[in-house]
Amino acid sequence: MKHINLSFAACGFLGIYHLGAASALCRHGKKLVKDVKAFAGASAGSLVASVLLTAPEKIEECNQFTYKFAEEIRRQSFGAVTPGYDFMARLRSGMESILPPSAHELAQNRLHVSITNAKTRENHLVSTFSSREDLIKVLLASSFVPIYAGLKLVEYKGQKWVDGGLTNALPILPVGRTVTISPFSGRLDISPQDKGQLDLYVNIAKQDIMLSLANLVRLNQALFPPSKRKMESLYQCGFDDTVKFLLKENWFE
């Protein structure tokens, strides 16, 4: 098999779609996953990429954490920006419980996390991690949407960083083929296929997304999580869209 990479797009709480995709890859694309050279992602996409690489057996645990996290946000008077609610602390607690002690070693030079320098607004892809805490900090930085996730920016190596999805929402690696995964309909390998829309696309932070009403709804759901039933449906969509891709590429097993 030629050089294959997997890249998961930034998408907030639509990351449940990515978990459905990851579950399908583990169940029906084992040979593909085994041969993947590198994993990449931004924001929620980087979180799922890190789990698929370092702790694939914990995908179901991630699902349950995501459902509970979303329920917490829905219960807040003003969602994630409710005064007194610590979005980043909750996210960190999930990472602490899911990522294994050796996560940084497993991720070394194989996980590429998109982050944005708060001062220069330049994008960086980080792929070296000196410790588990180092990895967690980079993942937190990649997921930090200013104001929404809090006011205190994430510090890493003496600089302040924010959400990688603001500058590169879907990292494409320079070597080999990068299989792209996104819960937004667009020019992607694995994504929903919106029907009956004008064939118009907009490039948002290096991700080609179709101009459609469904994508506008998804954008809202990324920051304001929908009901658990809808999130379960999004998970199933991620699973089903990935199965279609595996069948089409003759990687299904």
UniProtKB/Swiss-Prot annotation:
Transmembrane segments: none annotated. GO terms for molecular function: acylglycerol O-acyltransferase activity; all-trans-retinyl-palmitate hydrolase, all-trans-retinol forming activity; diolein transacylation activity; mono-olein transacylation activity; phospholipase A2 activity; retinyl-palmitate esterase activity; triacylglycerol lipase activity. The active site is at S43 (nucleophile), D163 (proton acceptor). Its EC number is 3.1.1.3, 3.1.1.4. One of its GO terms (biological process) is lipid homeostasis. It is found in: Mitochondrion. Residues 6-176 form the PNPLA domain. A motif (DGA/G) lies at residues 163-165. It catalyses: a triacylglycerol + H2O = a diacylglycerol + a fatty acid + H(+); a 1,2-diacyl-sn-glycero-3-phosphocholine + H2O = a 1-acyl-sn-glycero-3-phosphocholine + a fatty acid + H(+); an all-trans-retinyl ester + H2O = all-trans-retinol + a fatty acid + H(+); 2 a 1-acylglycerol = a 1,2-diacylglycerol + glycerol. One of its GO terms (cellular component) is cytoplasm. Its main location: mitochondrion. It is an enzyme of class 3 (hydrolase). The triglyceride lipase activity is inhibited by BEL ((E)-6-(bromomethylene)-3-(1-naphthalenyl)-2H-tetrahydropyran-2-one), a suicide substrate inhibitor. It comes from the Eukaryota. InterPro entries: Acyl_Trfase/lysoPLipase (IPR016035), PLPL (IPR033562), PNPLA4 (IPR033902), PNPLA_dom (IPR002641). Expressed in all tissues examined, including heart, brain, placenta, lung, liver, muscle, kidney, pancreas and spleen. It is linked to Defects in PNPLA4 may play a role in mitochondrial disorders characterized by complex IV deficiency. Has abundant triacylglycerol lipase activity. Transfers fatty acid from triglyceride to retinol, hydrolyzes retinylesters, and generates 1,3-diacylglycerol from triglycerides. Additionally possesses acylglycerol transacylase and phospholipase A2 activities. This is Patatin-like phospholipase domain-containing protein 4. It comes from Homo sapiens.
